[in-house]
């Protein structure tokens, strides 16, 4: 039986001094859990010490794609006319929360079209949870949506859902498809009942706010890119936005004009400058102010890309007079924003706008984030460093702000937060100033990663009341993707569970008070067929780890 030790050190704060070069942490546990597969193929560690008290870990499966729960089928996709499509196996975020004082799961599906479900739960006094009814959120107001990835709650009780994998509007064809069918964008025709001419790439790739008593709404002011997660800070005004671009993404910070109202504000993108050792210093480049209304008005006209930008092909590292070279996920381009469209351009093409503003657009697979508010640290998962973040692998004129050694296993970084310093930059106590690697995977032979270290980190969650960062994996470089607990004070890494074979670990969210207990939400996307029930194919699933004592 694997024993996992979890400690409490409430006085710890993130160090302000530059760190030493990264050293792999001590690891607790064997390379693979020896426990047999449990519910839905999950392998769970045995006992843990939780804040000094022995605790037997418990995983509670709650929902599976295709389950009929009450009157609806969990994960059923529909077209805009209500025609039933397939059941989506791309279950991603599935977070436990309270709605009107009652527990529920809010779940995202990474499909085309995407879907969001809300599942009511019953809670027993001993911490047992059970799904009682599910309902699909009507996404008509946001044209269905595309690839709903991670999510986060707001202090106002709403929910921010992130759409990733935005298509390149430069490649839109007259029939509504995009020429390279990026991430199968053209499959969105299913939402439009086969008529993709009614759609535009700029309708997808946004943060969507879900409320109890209002239709879902795009937050156009937050910008369009491959949103992994929009994470609000405690001031309910500052929101960090991670970009799940394959090789040319940015890190964004949005500041709303008014707390809790994300319909207007200033969007910033980070410039990373190499400092001492492994540290990078962060400065913030403004992409300007915008409102939902002014961006939505431009998109409603369904403009061509060239109606908003002047475009030319670079000659090496040179552009025609008046145009500027921008290196992003889409490669090197010469661009200039049309006069009068600056606000809209900065949002419909936020990554390109970030490059034009001098921000760093070299991050690869910037994934989940988690906030340690007491330690003034924001944690960010970078799933790998193999192209954009590695020196010399991009074309002429690329700046190479990031100078990382290639590492296909990726890492988790710690961003130290403090008061905004630049007069023209973001303000308040939640502005990131430095970034340093906290924990990195260790490459092994044959495109693998060492089993006693993390590999391809994705979802993160900070466990309040401890010094523990939960880390979920999404890759193919371990025998099975794992959920880890990392004690940031002791520097100890512990494997807590392994996903079903072939599945990624996703949907992490710490919920501290449900019926007197605390839980860690966790989901498993696209398991291998051998973990299906007797009815047939593999089924994504979600549940909770816990209860943990409060």
Which positions does each model-derived feature cover?
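Bacterial signal peptide processing site
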Residues: 12-13
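Conserved small-residue
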Residues: 17-550
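Sec-dependent signal peptide recognition
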Residues: 1-4
């Amino acid at each position: 039986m694997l024993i996992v030790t979890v400690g409490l050190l409430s006085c710890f704060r993130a160090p302000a001094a530059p760190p030493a070069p990264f050293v792999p942490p001590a690891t607790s546990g064997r390379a693979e859990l020896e426990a047999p597969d449990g519910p839905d193929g999950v392998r769970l560690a045995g006992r843990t010490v939780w804040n000094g008290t022995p605790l037997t870990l418990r995983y509670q499966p709650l929902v599976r794609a295709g389950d009929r729960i009450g009157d609806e089928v969990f994960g059923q996709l529909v077209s805009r006319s209500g025609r039933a499509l397939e059941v989506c196996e791309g279950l991603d975020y599935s977070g436990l929360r309270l709605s009107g004082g009652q527990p529920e799961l809010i779940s995202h599906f990474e499909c085309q079209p995407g879907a969001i479900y809300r599942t009511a739960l019953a809670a027993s006094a001993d911490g047992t949870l059970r799904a009682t009814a599910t309902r699909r959120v009507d996404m008509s107001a946001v044209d269905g949506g595309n690839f709903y990835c991670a999510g986060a709650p707001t202090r106002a009780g709403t929910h921010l859902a992130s759409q990733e994998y935005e298509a390149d509007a430069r490649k839109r064809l007259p029939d509504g498809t995009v020429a390279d069918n990026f991430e199968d964008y053209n499959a969105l025709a299913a939402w439009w009942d086969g008529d993709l001419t009614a759609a535009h790439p700029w309708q997808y790739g946004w943060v969507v706010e879900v409320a109890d008593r209002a239709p879902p709404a795009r937050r156009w002011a937050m910008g369009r890119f491959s949103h992994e997660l929009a994470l609000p800070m405690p001031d309910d005004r500052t929101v960090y936005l991670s970009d799940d671009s394959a090789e040319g993404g940015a890190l964004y910070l949005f500041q709303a004009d008014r707390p809790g109202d994300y319909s207007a504000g200033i969007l910033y993108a980070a410039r990373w400058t190499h400092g001492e050792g492994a540290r990078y210093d962060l400065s913030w480049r403004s992409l300007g102010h915008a409102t939902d209304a002014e961006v939505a008005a431009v998109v409603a006209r369904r403009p061509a890309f060239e109606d908003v930008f002047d475009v030319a092909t670079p000659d090496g590292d040179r552009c025609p007079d008046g145009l500027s070279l921008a290196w992003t996920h889409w490669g090197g381009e010469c661009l200039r924003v049309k006069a009068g469209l600056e606000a809209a351009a900065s949002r419909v093409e936020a990554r390109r706008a970030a490059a034009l503003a001098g921000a760093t657009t070299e991050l690869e697979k910037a994934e989940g984030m988690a906030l340690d508010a007491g330690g003034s640290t924001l944690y960010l998962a970078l799933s790998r460093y193999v192209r954009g973040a590695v020196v010399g692998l991009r074309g002429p004129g690329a700046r190479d702000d990031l100078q990382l050694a290639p590492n296909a296993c990726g890492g988790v970084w710690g961003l130290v937060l403090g008061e905004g310093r630049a007069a023209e930059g973001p303000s308040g106590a939640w502005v990131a100033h430095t970034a340093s690697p906290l924990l990195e995977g260790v490459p092994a032979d044959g495109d693998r990663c060492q089993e006693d270290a993390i590999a391809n980190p994705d979802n993160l969650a900070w466990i309040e009341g401890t010094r523990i960062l939960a880390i979920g994996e999404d890759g193919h470089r371990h025998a099975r993707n794992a959920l880890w607990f990392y004690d940031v004070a002791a520097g100890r890494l512990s494997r807590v569970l392994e996903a079903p074979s072939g599945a990624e670990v996703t949907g992490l969210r710490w919920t501290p008070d449900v019926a007197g207990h605390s839980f860690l939400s966790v989901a498993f996307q696209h398991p291998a067929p051998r973990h299906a029930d007797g009815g047939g194919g593999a089924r994504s699933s979600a549940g909770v780890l816990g209860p943990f004592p409060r």
